Amino acid sequence: MSNGTIVQCIGAVVDIQFPRDQMPKIYEALTLADEGSSFAEQGLTFEVQQQLGDGVVRTIALGSSDGLRRGMPVSRTGAPISVPVGHGTLGRIMDVLGRPIDEAGPINADEKRAIHQHAPKFDELSPSVELLETGIKVIDLVCPFAKGGKVGLFGGAGVGKTVNMMELINNIAKQHSGLSVFAGVGERTREGNDFYHEMEESNVLDKVAMVFGQMNEPPGNRLRVALTGLTMAEKFRDEGRDILFFVDNIYRYTLAGTEVSALLGRMPSAVGYQPTLAEEMGVLQERITSTKTGSITSIQAVYVPADDLTDPSPATTFQHLDSTVVLSRDIAALGIYPAVDPLDSSSRQLDPQVVGEEHYQVARGVQQTLQRYKELRDIIAILGMDELSPEDKQAVARARKIQRFLSQPFHVAEVFTGSPGKYVPLAETIRGFKMIVEGECDALPEQAFYMVGTIDEAFEKAKKLQ
């Protein structure tokens, strides 16, 4: 295959000229030929995005474009970006191209797969109604997860998306004997480092493959790293395994597309996002699915810009998910963690035919009580509690207890809180909230419910408070 030469370089977008009859295909990987690349990154990879005609292709650089200049030689690989898959990736940290970044030697993988694959066909899909217990009360009660489902953790800056994600990894990945893939998309390097050490200390590192394209990396890396992680997860699924796939953060995937969209010559759409936002999200999300061979249970953190859930990026993500866990700044301000909003969060699994009649009625009872409290808040603020009817006073008292009982100490936050983390089985969660809703805990002070695990702990705490 003949070489091409760089003809234009604007940030991460590079135009490369090839002979007219040797134009590379869309998504083909190109590499910087070694000669003359003393200033630029050795072996820099480009991915073809557009064919401009006359032998010129427009590409995105998957790495820093510092030091590139016109006339540099670029060679074709004849194939899309391919990454190592299989058991050789477990316990390793890789970048967008599947290269190791943990300084632990080369990756021993028998197979490489292209990161661009078709989603499974409709007749291969396998919907699941089996519940996945998380041990986090508010999630198990109000927005239960399905095994093989897709979950989104929505929240603005600093309300606890990553801590919730880490607790879910702690509770599910450690209990779950299967394999996990973690894709760090445009997040802090420190969090990736913490995650690695957390897995190492828990002795589950040999069951996790990690792929990172962090905040400091060029947009090309952040745009493709989610696909790299997904390709590794798909390989395990196709072997008949049940996989956990964690993505932190899906918003940065969208943002990376926005950064290069204008440079690629596309007209921006609403709020400056790329016009292909829905398609890019669909291409990724449709591949994260369970087939008759194996399942992928995906948990994705979604940053909500300016706490606005109607922003095009989170709004586009909503339609692909089975469960949505919405983290609220108002609840975090009350000191209730996890700051999950039980009225905003929802799940397709919360159906009496799936979770059972008792679970459904308790969850709806909890939401009803909290909704009544929300409606009465303005009246209480203006007139005070004394003006309420006895029924409303009782509803408010129970709602405040429910609100506090929805809090829970996390294992991953032990170092900050000083209190040991609690894993609460689903049956205990239902029993506890049922007792509060039915009035069996009316005599207990509301402080007794704050930061405890089961309802029995609340009774013990109440005795100490008296």
Swiss-Prot record:
Reaction it catalyzes: ATP + H2O + 4 H(+)(in) = ADP + phosphate + 5 H(+)(out)
Annotated ATP binding sites: G155, G156, A157, G158, V159, G160, K161, T162
A Pfam family it matches: ATP-synt_VA_C
One Gene Ontology term of the molecular function aspect: ATP binding
Membrane topology, record value: Peripheral membrane protein
Domain of life: Bacteria
Gene Ontology terms: cellular component: plasma membrane; proton-transporting ATP synthase complex
Keywords on record: ATP synthesis, ATP-binding, Cell inner membrane, Cell membrane, CF(1), Hydrogen ion transport, Ion transport, Membrane, Nucleotide-binding, Translocase, Transport
Subcellular location: Cell inner membrane
Entry's EC annotation: 7.1.2.2
PANTHER family the record matches: ATP SYNTHASE, ATP SYNTHASE SUBUNIT BETA, MITOCHONDRIAL
Family to which this protein belongs: Belongs to the ATPase alpha/beta chains family.
Protein name per UniProt: ATP synthase subunit beta
Record organism: Bordetella avium (strain 197N)
Taxonomic lineage of the native organism: Bacteria, Pseudomonadati, Pseudomonadota, Betaproteobacteria, Burkholderiales
